[in-house]
Design a protein with these regions (language model features):
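Glycan-recognition surfaces
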Residues: 1-44
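Flexible loop/turn segments at secondary-structure boundaries
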Residues: 14-19, 40-42, 48-49, 107-110, ...
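Catalytic cores of secreted or luminal carbohydrate-active enzymes
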Residues: 26-78
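A generic secondary-structure signal marking the coil-to-beta-strand transition
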Residues: 30, 96-98, 171-173
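Conserved, mostly hydrophobic/aromatic
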Residues: 32, 100, 129
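Carbohydrate-binding surface patches
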Residues: 80-123
Length: 180
């Protein structure tokens, strides 16, 4: 098994040159964060909205790079098994910080909220849970953008964390957890 720091993960052009798939720029950036992170596209040929998102994606890379490079990786759910979503997280060695990536590959009508049981956290630590990158199409739940919760590690690992509702296919969100 290779560490995440050895995995090339880049934001590619869209539609993808290999499979022709159309995936939101945000999702491509969120997924690329759990690897070496980079861009494989001509920025002069992408929409201005995507160009405007690049500084934020690079800032997120710098913010989470040490965590991704040195943390422990946990695969929480696989699209290959559930045919709906992927979910994985990286937890720092001292268990004081984690980054969860949730990707809704395919949306389902009238689908109830998903509770994802997290892994690798300190059971007795209280974590500040921050849903990042929220917008009108990728909201952080019924309480609005940038909802913050305080939950214990044992609660997050045994009861789980409710994933935000998202409209459409190939949507993603990052959830940052910081021990208080």
């Amino acid at each position: 098994i290779y560490p995440l720091s050895a995995m090339g993960a880049h934001v590619s052009d869209c539609p993808n040159h290999t499979v022709g798939r159309v995936t939101p720029f945000k999702t491509r950036g969120d997924v690329a964060l759990c690897g070496t992170f980079g861009y494989e596209l001509d920025i002069t040929r992408i929409p201005q909205e995507d160009r405007d998102a690049i500084p934020g994606q690079i800032a997120a890379y710098h913010r989470y790079n040490d965590l991704v490079r040195n943390g422990d990786y946990y695969r929480l759910a696989s699209y290959q098994e559930n045919n709906i979503y992927d979910c994985y997280m990286v937890v720092s060695k001292d268990k004081k910080e984690a980054l969860l990536t949730y990707v809704q590959v395919l949306n389902r009508p009238n689908f109830k909220s998903r509770m994802i049981k997290l892994a690798g956290l300190a059971p007795d630590k209280k974590y500040k849970v921050l849903y990042e990158g929220a917008d009108e199409n990728n909201n952080s739940g019924s309480d609005g953008e940038n909802q913050v919760q305080m939950l214990y590690g044992d609660t997050l690992m045994s009861a789980g964390l409710r994933m935000p509702g998202m409209w459409g296919d190939f949507k993603s969100t990052l959830i940052h957890l910081v021990a208080e």
